[in-house]
Amino acid sequence: DGVEPTAENIENGTYTVSRPFNVATKGELTNEAAQDFMNYIMSTEGQAIVEEEGYIPVDGAEAFTSTNPSGSVTVSGSSSVSPLMEKLKEAYETVNPNVSIELQTSDSTTGMTNTINGMCDIGMASRELKQEELDAGLVNTVIATDGIAIIVNNESPIDELTSEQVRDIYLGNITDWSELG
């Protein structure tokens, strides 16, 4: 669509190829350590890490104040969210060394299923939650937005694609560059 994939364009919606990084819990968190970690993720300090790692932070973050709980937290899911979550985990554990966080990397659906089944405290998804996941009691929180750059080989005669063309390529409706004529 002729729009550069910059943070500003992703935030203002003119560049539309992006996805949310969601975390989900089964209803209200009862694990005090997990709630404290969630508060950290959504804080000014947590969102600064989101931005440092190249993602778009959420608005409205406030300074973090820990309740200083102890215990363990299990986070499960998306391999796309996992590298960011690892950075957030490391930073939080320096703020509160009395909490141990186990990060289980798999995929978004496994993370949501594990959360629904009580196998983890927090699930990670690099997509919107499905209606059946919400119906099962999951509560999602967007922790970041991930802009996705569409890259074409320099040797290709194509120097710009529309959103519809990209969609059709990924759906298999366009299978040859000549079809973009």
Name each region found by the language model.
Residues 1-181:
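Exported/periplasmic ABC-transporter solute-binding proteins
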